Amino acid sequence: MTAAGHDEEFPYEKRLEGLLEELRGHSRIQVDETRLGPIEMPFDNFGEVFKDLVKWYDLPFGEPIREKFFRYAEVEASWRSADPQSELVGEFSLSHVFRSVVENHVSDTWEGKDDEERELYGELRIFDDTPRTGSGRMAALRATRGTTDPEIWFFDMRQGALEMDLDYPAYLDTLLLTKGTIGWQYLFCDAGFGDVGFTPLAKGLQEMVEVIPRLFPQYDYAELASRLRERM
């Protein structure tokens, strides 16, 4: 496949590659790691991936999710501000959509404390994690049979699982904006200052909406800033 064909067929994959280049190329960001995982069969086959999700897991994901397809087994970055006084830190580890559904079960690690929570955890599949910092924060899609547009949940071991006010495509688009700043997901959850999960991250999130727009002025951060104000 030519570079042009790759860009046209898998546009979100190209945007992820661009995100890693942005992080590596900025003098005010100290990058600990950026990594594109392998492209492996059969995960590289767009048609077969979504056909098998329907056949084996009854997950007929809709076109907006399919448009965010990327072939890499995982896409990862870990970084921090180059300013030693800064609390701005980021990490993400995105998993291929098929691997997320098949391998990354929240219930493998967290059982839940009651029947409702156990049912929820049994359906959550992790697609974004923080393995390098070990922060215990991750995002998961709810693999309810028959869904075309799965719920997205943020799991923080300090606060449990919180449903997010966005869908899978919007999550992936917002990740590009935030660069994976630790805790950005709280801006789309019913949580705020005083909550055990949000409060320790408030200063870093405040710095995110103040500093990152100056580092990457080509993007619009107005909604993120507004959401943070609502939670402070």
Provide a role label for each language-model segment.
Residues 119, 133, 178-185, 189-190:
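Acidic, metal/cofactor-coordinating or nucleic-acid-engaging core segments within structured domains
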Residues 127, 139-141, 152:
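Hydrophobic beta-strand residues in large extracellular and virion-surface proteins
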Residues 150-186:
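Compact, glycine/acidic-enriched structural inserts
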Residues 134-145:
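Broad, structure-driven detector of short, well-ordered beta-strand segments within folded domains
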Residues 130-136, 212, 216:
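Aromatic/basic-lined ligand-recognition segments
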Residues 185, 191-232:
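Charge-dense, low-complexity intrinsically disordered regions
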Residues 13-16, 43, 165-169, 181, ...:
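Alpha-helix initiation and N-capping motif
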Residues 1-134, 230-232:
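A surface-exposed partner-binding patch
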